[in-house]
Amino acid sequence: MLIETEATPNPLTRKYLPGRTVMATGSRDFPTASAAEASPLAHALFATGDVDGVFFGRDFISVSAKPAAAWEELEPDVLSILLDHFVTDAPLFAPGTAAGIAIDPNDDGAAMAVEEDPADADIVDQIKELIETRVRPAVAQDGGDIVYRGYAHGTLYLAMQGACSGCPSSAVTLKRGIEGLIKHYVPEVQNVEAV
């Protein structure tokens, strides 16, 4: 089995493509080791001691290293863990864990950043459609994801996950790329903020 490795714009994160589906629907972000307890794979990656975050996308896994870690030393361990997981067809999540349920990117259970005005429902629908069809596929190419967190008074709130979380260029991506696209198609949006 061959697992492709890709660099991401975030120098601390690598994207791994196993050549098969990782998450059939939604995505999963494990920003801490304690969040990874429901996934034997994510738990094993954190157990290396040098992993700072794990993200499961549709057909990829992003692994973020701690700032002091050296990828030259960490990558063989990561590849070994990933190969072992996929060669043995191990489950992605521990049996019986509710955390194994895939997360709908528009409803992952996290709190909204603001209370939305029901009068903005059409605007919110337009925003969510753009995020789903234009933004998320582009961000996934870099090993990350964007999650809607609310819209109020002209400001759109988004959470960045995977390789996008903590990436030095994420502010530029958010402001120049995502904000520009959303404002072009939904002129009611005046500002985009990360939460």
What are these model-predicted stretches?
Residues 1-195:
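Domain-level signature for proteins that mediate thiol-based redox and metal-cofactor handling
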